[in-house]
């Protein structure tokens, strides 16, 4: 049974695409066709995204103070809006869901302008610029870490959690069994979907300072930018540490599932996946994130005892080496941290968000949805 088309719009980074992918799987299972609007950056994820069709619509962010750049961006947005209006008119979706990032602006402006029931999903604890620009126009706002008491938009905000992909749910079934003294210790290091330059130097430097008997236990999976990959590999080879280093791992969820400890940034999708899988982590919020959203994302997990959060400026090689040495020596503490992380997870977020999408598509209000689903997003 074909229930119609749901159009998903997401910026082309993992933080936006992954929750959209999770919702797409759920909607497809319920009988909907799913189309994705994104930008060219999303090509690396396209193979696993269960879309009936993927559309690239022109868009741009207006961040420059250069008048010529601003004019170019405005023109690109105008072209994108016209393209998106034609697409929405042609597809006639029953609902449109935006997941943030500037590529979502044209399709959401088009859908709301044409009267199509529309929702935005904000993954972070602090709303991003694209979603802020669209918040007043949409029927509902779904939040990952966004508080339900969302200021002027509290009435239409639902705390759904961040949808996680089937691969993450599969990894969550792997029980956490911490490495014991003398056993191999699996360390997974990544900086979100695009890697992190800081970790490329900081982690090898920290491992270098560890005692030989501890260093010999460590096996590293590390995401590194293409330009950093060779130097990171060389650093680990010099230390005699086994390491798998790559700019992108298509099976990162299963690698997290096999990890004893994770070191990462604290983007919303990362924190959500760590909590659903239930793995101890050292989170280092990206210091230049707009509105410091990564620090806010990590706060709840840290408060629950599910992660250690360290500012990048305070994380010297000596500090990180000490943290790693303690982790290798205290498997019981790692087990407790893993359990605390898992207790905060929301593995059913995709189902809750899909329920909200169906409610809005059927013309029901957010208040009706909250009343019917008492305790959800209240």
Curated annotation (Swiss-Prot):
Keywords: Cell cycle, Cell division, Cell inner membrane, Cell membrane, Cell shape, Cell wall biogenesis/degradation, Glycosyltransferase, Membrane, Peptidoglycan synthesis, Transferase. GO terms for molecular function: UDP-N-acetyl-D-glucosamine:N-acetylmuramoyl-L-alanyl-D-glutamyl-meso-2,6-diaminopimelyl-D-alanyl-D-alanine-diphosphoundecaprenol 4-beta-N-acetylglucosaminlytransferase activity; undecaprenyldiphospho-muramoylpentapeptide beta-N-acetylglucosaminyltransferase activity. It holds the Pfam family Glyco_transf_28. UDP-N-acetyl-alpha-D-glucosamine binds at residues 13-15, 124, 165, 193, 294. InterPro entries: GlcNAc_MurG, Glyco_trans_28_C, GlycoTrans_28_N. GO terms for biological process: carbohydrate metabolic process; cell division; cell wall organization; lipid glycosylation; peptidoglycan biosynthetic process; regulation of cell shape. GO terms for cellular component: plasma membrane. It is an enzyme of class 2 (transferase). It catalyses: di-trans,octa-cis-undecaprenyl diphospho-N-acetyl-alpha-D-muramoyl-L-alanyl-D-glutamyl-meso-2,6-diaminopimeloyl-D-alanyl-D-alanine + UDP-N-acetyl-alpha-D-glucosamine = di-trans,octa-cis-undecaprenyl diphospho-[N-acetyl-alpha-D-glucosaminyl-(1->4)]-N-acetyl-alpha-D-muramoyl-L-alanyl-D-glutamyl-meso-2,6-diaminopimeloyl-D-alanyl-D-alanine + UDP + H(+). Pathway: Cell wall biogenesis; peptidoglycan biosynthesis. It comes from the Bacteria. Its main location: membrane. It is found in: Cell inner membrane. It is a peripheral membrane protein. Its EC number is 2.4.1.227. Cell wall formation. Catalyzes the transfer of a GlcNAc subunit on undecaprenyl-pyrophosphoryl-MurNAc-pentapeptide (lipid intermediate I) to form undecaprenyl-pyrophosphoryl-MurNAc-(pentapeptide)GlcNAc (lipid intermediate II). Belongs to the glycosyltransferase 28 family. MurG subfamily. This is UDP-N-acetylglucosamine--N-acetylmuramyl-(pentapeptide) pyrophosphoryl-undecaprenol N-acetylglucosamine transferase. It comes from Agrobacterium fabrum (strain C58 / ATCC 33970).
């Amino acid at each position: 049974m074909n229930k119609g088309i749901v159009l998903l719009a997401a910026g082309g980074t993992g933080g936006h695409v992954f929750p959209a992918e999770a919702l797409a799987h759920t909607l497809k299972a319920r009988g909907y066709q799913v189309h994705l609007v994104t930008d060219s950056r999303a090509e690396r994820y396209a193979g696993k995204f269960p879309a009936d069709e993927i559309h690239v619509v022109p868009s741009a962010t207006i961040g420059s103070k250069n008048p010529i750049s601003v004019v170019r961006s405005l023109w690109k947005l105008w072209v994108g809006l016209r393209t998106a209006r034609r697409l929405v008119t042609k597809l006639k979706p029953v609902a449109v869901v935006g997941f943030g990032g500037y590529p979502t602006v044209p399709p959401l402006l088009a859908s709301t302008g044409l009267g199509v029931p529309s929702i935005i999903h904000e993954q972070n604890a602090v709303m991003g610029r694209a979603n802020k620009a669209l918040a007043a126009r949409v029927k509902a706002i779904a939040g990952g870490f966004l508080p339900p008491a969302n200021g002027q938009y509290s009435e239409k905000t639902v705390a759904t959690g961040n949808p996680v992909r089937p691969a993450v749910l599969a990894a969550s079934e792997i029980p956490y069994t911490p490495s014991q003294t003398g056993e191999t210790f699996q360390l997974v290091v990544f900086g979100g979907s695009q890697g992190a330059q800081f970790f490329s130097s900081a982690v090898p430097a920290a491992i270098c300072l560890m005692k030989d008997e501890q260093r010999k236990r460590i096996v590293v999976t590390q995401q590194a930018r293409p330009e950093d990959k060779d130097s990171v590999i060389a650093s680990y080879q010099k230390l005699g540490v086994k390491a798998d280093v790559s700019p992108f791992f298509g099976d990162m969820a299963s690698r997290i599932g096999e990890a004893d400890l994770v070191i990462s940034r604290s983007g919303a999708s990362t924190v959500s996946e760590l909590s659903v899988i239930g793995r101890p982590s050292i989170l280092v919020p990206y210091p230049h994130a707009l509105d410091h959203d990564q620090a806010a994302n990590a706060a709840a997990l840290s408060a629950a005892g599910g992660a250690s959060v360290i500012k990048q400026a305070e994380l010297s090689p000596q500090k990180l080496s000490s943290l790693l040495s303690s982790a290798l020596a205290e498997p019981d503490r790692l087990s407790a941290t893993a359990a605390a992380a898992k207790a905060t997870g929301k593995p059913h977020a995709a189902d809750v968000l899909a329920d909200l999408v169906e409610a809005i598509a059927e013309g029901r209000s957010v208040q009706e949805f909250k009343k019917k689903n008492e305790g959800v997003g209240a």
